[in-house]
Each structure stands twice: as structure tokens, then as C-alpha cells.
Amino acid sequence: MPTIPAGQRVWLLELPWGGLGGGMPAGVTYYKSLTAHAYVGTYLPEALEPYSSKAYSSLRWQEDELNGTEGPGATAAPMTLRPEQRADVEAITAAADRGFRQVHLANDVGTGKTLVAVAAAKAIARARGARTILVTVDRPARITIPSWRRTIAALNSTDGVDDELRWIIMSSDSLGKLMARNGRPRLKVDVAVIDEAHQFRHASKRTSYMRRLTRMDAPHETAPFVLTITATPGHHPGEWGYMSSLYAQVHGDPPARWADFGRALADRGVPLEPSYGKWTWSAEAKDSLQTQQAAISDVRDILLRHDPPLMLTRSAPWGPPPFDVDLVELTPDQWRAYELEWGDFQREMQLARTGKNVARGLAALVRLRQKASMIRVEHTVAAAKAELARGYQVLIATEMVTTAAHPVAEMLEADGIPVARIYGSNPDAEAERMRFQRGEAPVVVFNTPTAINLQAGEQFADGTYATDTPRRGFFHQARYSGLLAEQTMGRAHRNHQICAWSLLAAAGTIEERAGTVMLSRLIASATSTDADASTFSEVARVFGIDWIPAARLADELG
């Protein structure tokens, strides 16, 4: 363990293996017991600042423990809960006040579950005098962790108080870092938020870690409060094992009696049977969709119809497509590559400005966006793969071909994922569209914003239908035109089919600024047609420009 002299502190660092530039920076030591690099001193050298621990990370938690004081938290523009979100928070806290150990939040994509979860966790922790809140998130961690960090910081800003809560955000794949060598948790969790809880529907190492960290086998009265979140809990009730202790509590049983969740349900008449170490529908249920739906309803309603409700569901309203922004945090190496390109851009732009060469300036801007797009391809691919694992078909919208559409498609196909390509001058665009619509290719990469249908359930000319698999959309690059952005989202968000969209952008780069322009245009176009701009107002808060009235933005963009 590092020795910390009086008047100094330790910084734990996220350094790549082998150090920087092939060597270890001066003053940095790797500590096997911490599985981290550390620097001890009175201040952190500027060259090491990009590698310092992030707020609410497990590395920061270790760092705070070593120093005996807490490092700075994150900051973000305040967020305000909508009335229905406040109602959900009140329902969750009411269940906690009644002594229930868990609530499951199953609202649709785009309804603001993250904001609800953070607000509810804060309220429950305050009421209980608790301190430590664990949040587990799904892949890709470089998108999901920053998103949760921003939401926590935003609500801290809204409250305007320091509640001294200790948040730890972990990807489900990293939960082992919170376990000691004896297999026990290294910290006592008071409140846990398990996002995308369907990750834990099967027996696995990470499921075992989650169960131990949340003390699922502990008596109900001593267990931490757990909020599980997913709109897609599993293919059948036998996969809802992450709620086993809650079902035990509702039935007045000890948790151990429901630890084998599939067995407990089967013993109570749910049509399940074991198969290759897992539970699945019985032969009778496999032949009857009605039997399956009835069984799901019966098991779900135990929580949904309970007083107080222990499962919350809220459908996404028809109207504007659910739209949010995911700002990706580049790795230090990616940042270095970006900053080199940024320096080249500034020099080129200065020459263009001096010579009043508009074409040269625009060309420099395009090159920078191309480079920024290339750096982030792997993040878009990771986001798409995560949504495929959740049961969606994925749309990826791009503007550029050689530095966006093509590399994204190539990387997905290299991982064995078929991709429909609707970009460039592809003469087989319709055949590619049909590959996606019929489910032969679960991903479509396209830059055609109009005149194509990509929604679920489309009826074809021959009377057959597209797959009913829900769609999920990503903008790999921001669209400067609000109309084109709306039309792009409308490729799958149409005909009573909901398709949530996210803009992926690298935080602190030209892409983030492009996203601000895109957001402004979207608000302007929505306002000009008297549409509901509330969805896009949520995104404005991410960028910290929610102080600009939508109508004023529309006037300025006139």
C-alpha cells in the first residue's frame, strides 16, 4: 500500500498497461494490492490529470478510503423531474417506507428511468440515514457510466445540498473489483440500483457478485433496498431471478426458499421446466402463446397489483420519438489523437481565415469531424451490440460514408453481426432494406433520411410483415438540419411504432458542439409546428443550454 506523508495525498490513476509512451511516469508506482497505479504528492502533475479517478467510480472510492477524505464530485446542469417521474419516485419510496426490500422499475425506453432511479435512491438513503449507493450498469461502460454520473450530479445541483452520499457506479463486468479475496463484499451497500437487470437473469459470476453485494440471501429486515430496472425482464418468468428475494418477501418466505426462482415458480404451477441447467417454458407452454402470456401476467401481477405496487410500468407516449444524448468519454490515448487533429484544424483554420478562404475552412471542419468520427467508431459498435443483446434491431444513422458508415459496418461484421447497408450509391438499397426488415440483418447502417421504412411490423406489398422486434436508433454523427434529423428518426418511429433514439458524441469535442446545433434545430422545428418539444428539452439540460427558451431558439434560427 502507498505511504502518504503528512500534507500529501494519493491519487489513483487509470493508466494503460506499460505506462505512457512505453514508460512509467516519474513518481508513479503500480500497487498489486490495489490493482491500480498511484501517485503520492501535494498536487497531481498536469500530465497525469487526464488519468485521475472519476467521481463515483470504484477507483475514486479506493482513493477516498486511502486519503480519509473525499475527492471532488461531478458537476452538471440541474435536472427537474416531470410530474409522472415524481409520481414514480413517490411510489418507490412508499414501498421502501413500508419495509419492502425491492421495487422493479419496468417503464418503457425514453420515459426517464435513470432520473427516477437516482431521485428515489437519494430519497430512500436520506430517510434511512444511509450513505453508500451502488449503481450497476450495462455495457458499453464508456457511455453508461458517464450518463449515470451526469444524472447524479444534475440532481445534486437541483437539490443544492451536499447530502454526503457515496455513489459507486460499476459496470456489471467489473463487480469483482468490489469483492475481497474471501469472496465477501469489500463494502456495505445501503441502497443498490441495478440497471438493465436482465443481465443477471442467468447464473454467472457477475450474477453471484450482484447477489452478494445486495445481500439477496439476507433476512428481509437487514437487506439493503434494491431498485432493479429493465423494460425487458426476461423471456419468461423463470429468468426473473434477480427479483427472487422480493417474491419471497411478498409470500412471507425466507429468501432461501426462492433462491432457485424457476423451481419456486414451477412448484406454484407456472409452466416451466429445467433444460440444460436453465429454466424454460414447458412443452405445453411452448405450443401456446396464450399460456405463456397468462403465466407472465400472473407472475407480474403479484408485484404490479400489490399494495403498495412493487413493479412500476409506464408506456412511452405516442408523439415525438424518445431522444437523448450519450456523451462518450474518450480514453486518454483517444484524447491525444483528437488533440493532435484539433491542433492541425486550428492551424488550417487560421490560414483559411487569414486568406478569407471559406472553402478551405469548411474542408478543415469536415476533416476534423471525420477524424473525431473515426476515433469513436468502437463506441458506436459497442452501443449497438448492447442493444442487440437486449433484444432490439438497431439503426445507425451517419452523414459520412468512408469515415463513419463504412467503418461502423465493417467492425460489426467483423464480430459476426450481419449489417444491412443503405448508404452511398448502393444499387441494392431496397434489397438491403428488406434484409433488415425481415430480420436477416439485425443492424442497418444508413445515411438516407427519407423515403425508406424501417419500422417494426411494416406490411409489405405481398401481404407479409416486417419483424415485430422493437427498433433502437443511434446517430453516429449529429445532423445539422433539424428537419433531416426528424425525418431520420421517423424511419422507425412511425405507424404507432416507438423507436427511441440517442445521439452519440465525444464529450468536449467538436462533435458535442455539433450536437448542440442539432438540438437547437430540433427544438426550433418542433416549436415551429406547435409540436411537443419537451423531449428535446431533456437533451438541452445535458448540454447546459436549457436556459434558452425554445421559442427564442426558433427565432434566432429563423
Predicted regions and their residues:
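Walker A/P-loop
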Residues: 99-120
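Conserved P-loop NTPase motor "coupling/switch" region that bridges the ATPase
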Residues: 191, 208-314, 497-498
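Conserved RecA-like P-loop NTPase helicase motor core
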Residues: 171, 413, 418-515, 521
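Conserved Walker A/P-loop ATP-binding site and its immediately adjacent core
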Residues: 114-121, 129-153, 233-239, 399-405
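Accessory DNA-engaging acidic/polar modules
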Residues: 1-74
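Conserved RecA-like ASCE ATPase "motif II neighborhood" in helicase/translocase motors
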Residues: 165-218, 447-451, 456-458, 464
